[in-house]
Amino acid sequence: MSRENNCTTADLAWGIPSITQAWGLWALFGVVTMLLLISLAALLSQWTRGRRRTQEEQGPPSGRSVEEVPLYGNLHYLQTGRLSEESRSEEQDPSSGGLARGAEEATCYTSLQLRPAQGRIPSSGTPIKYCEVVLDSEPKPQASGPEPELYASVCAQTRRARASFPDQAYANSQPAPS
């Protein structure tokens, strides 16, 4: 049997019948294609809506854009290269005390802790624990050289009974004059 005997001139290509010969097959193909496209459009719509909703819930703190939120604390405005819009307008009007307020806002502080989601009640966070300066009277055996005797101890619960320096402002400063 040769292939030419089975093939008619009404075929679009080998094995694909024309619309007049198999209109029901082409109609079914069209319906399935339309349902597939509608399903794809609905899926993309739900995906973008859900993504937009999660971005609104997890958005930047206090309504500011991500570029405005500093990553590290204690950045002076000369180091960052920009001022806030409020301090720029206040520096232009010195009669309202804008220069003093602009100088106060020159240093930025931020917390590197994650903020709670906007739907929850914010907690007070962990309280700040201050350092104590203590004198280490126990010598440590080390051959590399002498270590300094004064050091700052963070959360030094076990060393609190040792000597502290209440009359000095800082660990390495001179005693307060009497």
Swiss-Prot record:
Q: In which tissues is it expressed?
A: Lymph node, spleen and thymus.
Q: Where is this region: Interaction with GRB2?
A: 72-75, 170-173
Topology of this chain in the membrane = Single-pass type III membrane protein
What biological-process GO terms show up in the record?
Answer: adaptive immune response; regulation of T cell activation; signal transduction; T cell homeostasis
InterPro entries attached here? Sit1
Can you tell which superkingdom this protein's organism belongs to? Eukaryota
Its transmembrane ranges are 24-44
Positions of post-translational Phosphoserine modification:
62, 65, 84, 87, 89, 164
Indicate where this protein resides in the cell. Cell membrane
Q: Give GO terms: molecular function aspect only.
A: kinase binding
Extracellular side stretches: 1-23
- On this chain, the residues bearing Phosphotyrosine are 72, 109, 130, 151, 170
Using the UniProt annotation, give all residue ranges assigned to the region (Disordered).
Answer: 81-102
Q: Which UniProt keywords apply?
A: Adaptive immunity, Cell membrane, Disulfide bond, Glycoprotein, Immunity, Membrane, Phosphoprotein, Signal-anchor, Transmembrane, Transmembrane helix
Tell me which residues are glycosylated: 6
The Phosphothreonine modification is found at: 126
Show the segment(s) annotated as Interaction with PTPN11.
128-133
According to the record, the residues making up region (Interaction with CSK) are 151-154
Q: What GO cellular-component annotations does this UniProt entry give?
A: plasma membrane
Oligomeric state and interaction partners are given as: Homodimer; disulfide-linked. When phosphorylated, interacts with PTPN11/SHP2, GRB2 and CSK.
Q: What does this protein do?
A: Negatively regulates T-cell antigen receptor (TCR)-mediated signaling. Involved in positive selection of T-cells.
* Protein name according to UniProt: Signaling threshold-regulating transmembrane adapter 1
